[in-house]
């Protein structure tokens, strides 16, 4: 199947936006979990999960905006997300965050595997995708460890 460079770049932007939206959901969910935790666990959640997700989210937003600008596409504004239905159990929110982080990582992995970033992307795009994936790679395991301790 053939495609134009413009169509392929549009697909890249759509895929990056999907992953960015998932990280926004993870941030919102972690924020909700923070409110339901004791101070010590909340501080650990902030340090081990929230800050890295926030960093990855910011990096991916900048990657999206920069790629769009460099190739003449409109820059998208990303809206904050909701943590979902309220729960008094912080593990529910952390599970939602983990699911969202894993969906973001999967979307970025599929994009990288498609070779579009190599064929029609640029160095800055590839660096942003790689840095984001490196930042979020260990977060699901960290979240599970943190919640295992919380459940005791």
Protein language model regions, located:
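Leu/Val/Ala/Ile-rich N-terminal alpha-helices, chiefly Sec-type signal peptides and the beginnings
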Residues: 1-57
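Preference for long, well-ordered alpha-helical segments
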Residues: 100-103, 107-152
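Conserved alpha-helical segments that form or flank metal/cofactor-binding pockets of metalloenzymes
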Residues: 51-73
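Short, charge/polar-rich alpha-helical segments
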Residues: 90-95
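Extended alpha-helical coiled-coil "stalk/arm" regions that scaffold and mediate dimerization/assembly
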Residues: 31-39, 71, 79, 151
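Short, charged/polar, low-complexity loop and linker segments
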Residues: 3-7, 76-89, 113-125
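A taxonomically broad motif for mature regions of secreted/extracellular
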Residues: 68-71, 75, 143, 147
């Amino acid at each position: 199947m053939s495609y134009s460079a413009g169509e392929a770049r549009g697909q890249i932007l759509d895929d990056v936006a999907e992953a960015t939206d998932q990280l926004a959901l993870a941030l919102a969910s972690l924020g909700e979990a923070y409110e339901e935790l004791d101070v010590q666990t909340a501080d650990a959640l902030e340090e081990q999960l929230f800050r890295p997700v926030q960093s990855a989210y910011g990096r991916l937003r900048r990657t999206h905006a920069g790629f769009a600008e460099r190739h003449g596409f409109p820059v998208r504004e990303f809206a904050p997300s909701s943590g979902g239905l309220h729960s008094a159990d912080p593990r529910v929110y952390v599970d939602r965050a983990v699911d969202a982080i894993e969906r973001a990582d999967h979307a970025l992995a599929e994009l990288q595997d498609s070779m579009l970033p190599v064929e029609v992307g640029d160095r800055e795009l590839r660096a942003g995708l790689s840095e984001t994936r490196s930042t979020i790679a260990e977060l699901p395991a960290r979240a599970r460890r943190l919640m295992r301790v919380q459940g005791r």
